[in-house]
Amino acid sequence: MSKVDYDSILKDFPFPPAVKEEIKAELEKHGLKKTEAKKVVEKCFQAYLANLMEPGEAAGIVAAQSIGEPGTQMTMRTFHYAGVAEINVTLGLPRLIEILDVRKNPSTPMMTIRLLPEYAKDREKAREVANRIEATYVKDVADIEVDIRRFTIIVKPDEKALERKGLTVEDLKSKIGKALKTEVEETEQGLAVQITEPSYKALMAAFDKLKDTVIMGLKEIKRVIIRKEEDEYVLYTEGSNLKKIMKVKGVDFTRTTTNNIYEIYEVLGIEAARNAIIREALDTLEEQGLEVDVRHIMLVADVMTADGELRQIGRHGVAGEKQSILARAAFEMTVNNLLDAAVRGEEDHLRGITENIIVGQPIKLGTGDVELVLKMGGKK
């Protein structure tokens, strides 16, 4: 049986190159005959034409409606587990608002950390990485007592807790000394810290500081959960610090991510932040059972990242930075915007949509995007 030349069939149809390659791959996969292949390509071309936008299409308005309408069906609940029973994250409408506002500090920062092959297959090795990441405080591995009479703090190490974390008494002693900038003595009761300033206030201040001293891990990572997914162990964290976690031994930073979009922007740049906005918004909508075409979200992400910096959708970002005075005033803070523009003597050239609707002029969208030219003279 002679091989069908699919290229000769496809060359008559003006598909984008990537679409042509995809169709060709599918035709080769199923080994269709020439007549069958032609019918399939014709069907694909009809679908392609049906999906093309009309000139002058209001892409922004359609995107706003397509995200906004499903948004009305989203729940207001803030906490729920995201596939991990022990970790709560913000979902639903509050999370979508967080994404579009590009909050620097999301209410429930969380990371998904994937490991290098030698650590991902073995639970004990995954636990080692988790210990290096999770914040371990002095109070987690020792009992802390205060001797008011002698102005001394006694730290009684818990041998089992230290062993679980892969620490020794020497490690604990060294960290306490660094934190309080003082000598630590080993006594029968435990590790003794003598307070230099003999006052109750100084003693209690040192006690509070010692309790919250991190002796291992990152202080931003409150908790780490290990889960087996398919054939590898994955770490989920409560808290986020992408920059430091990328340097932790055993972490596969090419597959590690956080739900803090601003942190992604600072560490990996604007293109990574754009992808994070798209992924997070899609995941939030899908978790609620809502289906939105990814291209609407891509348009929003493009607008938020177009200047090479993250801008929120709102009066402190995209909406507030419009050149038109009337467009800014129509969004929020009407009086303030009009007053400021009047004081500065600004002019509005009425180039956008909002301002033209306000003054009752045709807008540059759809049929209003073309200008008719009257041909004078000629045949009557």
UniProtKB/Swiss-Prot annotation:
Q: What is its main location?
A: cytoplasm
Name the UniProt key words of this record, in alphabetical order.
Cytoplasm, DNA-binding, DNA-directed RNA polymerase, Nucleotidyltransferase, Transcription, Transferase
User: What name appears for this protein in its UniProt entry?
Assistant: DNA-directed RNA polymerase subunit Rpo1C
Q: What does this protein do?
A: DNA-dependent RNA polymerase (RNAP) catalyzes the transcription of DNA into RNA using the four ribonucleoside triphosphates as substrates. Forms part of the jaw domain.
Q: Where's it found, cell-wise?
A: Cytoplasm
Q: Name one GO molecular function term.
A: DNA-directed RNA polymerase activity
Family membership noted in the UniProt record: Belongs to the RNA polymerase beta' chain family.
Mind naming one GO cellular-component term on file for this protein?
A: DNA-directed RNA polymerase complex
User: What reactions does this protein catalyze?
Assistant: RNA(n) + a ribonucleoside 5'-triphosphate = RNA(n+1) + diphosphate
User: What is the protein's quaternary organization?
Assistant: Part of the RNA polymerase complex.
**A GO biological-process term:** DNA-templated transcription
Q: Show the SUPFAM superfamilies listed in the entry.
A: beta and beta-prime subunits of DNA dependent RNA-polymerase
Name the Pfam families on file. RNA_pol_Rpb1_5
Check the record and name the HAMAP family matching this protein: RNApol_arch_Rpo1C
Query: Under which EC number(s) is this enzyme classified?
Result: 2.7.7.6
Q: Which organism does this sequence originate in?
A: Archaeoglobus fulgidus (strain ATCC 49558 / DSM 4304 / JCM 9628 / NBRC 100126 / VC-16)
- State the superkingdom: Archaea
For this protein, the record's InterPro entries field holds:
DNA-dir_RpoC_beta_prime, RNA_pol_Rpb1_5, RPO1C
